[in-house]
């Protein structure tokens, strides 16, 4: 679980790169110190790259994007109007038919209703079945391109 959360929280290098390119940046934890008007403009955080999943002895089905989405579940729990999704631009994620996964503030509740604990599914590397149970898989079909993975946090501000 720590490696998945690190993926979600490890933004410093991307932040510096964006600043070096002259882009305007904001850290989410700083928004509470800013004005309400400036916070209203934050609508999406987009990241690219590819994460690594280190499989243990026990593993189910899923890919790195599905694991990232499942790892976001406890971070999003109870948040309104905020979601996270991550997908492979080639339309496949790991050895599955899904391109990636989706989670929002209600995903934890929906998983609990299905009897699935996100931490257990992550430990077993079985994000596919966990997300499938709550309709949290993203499907695009093969795209014919493979640029990178794309992860997005959407915030209705």
Kindly give the residue locations of the regions a language model identified.
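Internal helix-turn-beta structural module
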Residues: 61, 70-157
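A glycine- and small/hydrophobic-rich beta-loop-beta segment
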Residues: 1-70, 74-78
């Amino acid at each position: 679980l720590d490696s998945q959360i690190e993926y979600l929280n490890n933004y410093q290098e991307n932040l510096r790169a964006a600043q070096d390119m002259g882009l305007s940046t904001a850290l989410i934890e700083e928004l509470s110190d800013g004005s309400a008007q400036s916070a209203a403009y934050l609508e999406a955080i987009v990241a690219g790259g590819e994460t690594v999943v280190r499989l243990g002895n026990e593993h189910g089905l899923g890919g790195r994007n599905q694991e990232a989405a499942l790892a976001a579940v406890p971070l999003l729990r109870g948040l309104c109007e905020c979601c996270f999704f991550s997908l492979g631009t080639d339309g496949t994620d790991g050895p599955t038919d899904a391109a990636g996964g989706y989670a929002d503030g209600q995903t934890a509740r929906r998983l609990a209703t299905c009897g699935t604990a996100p931490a257990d599914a992550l430990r077993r590397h079985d994000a596919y079945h966990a997300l499938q149970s709550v309709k949290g898989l993203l499907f695009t079909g093969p795209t014919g391109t493979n640029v990178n993975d794309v992860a997005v946090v959407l915030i209705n501000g």
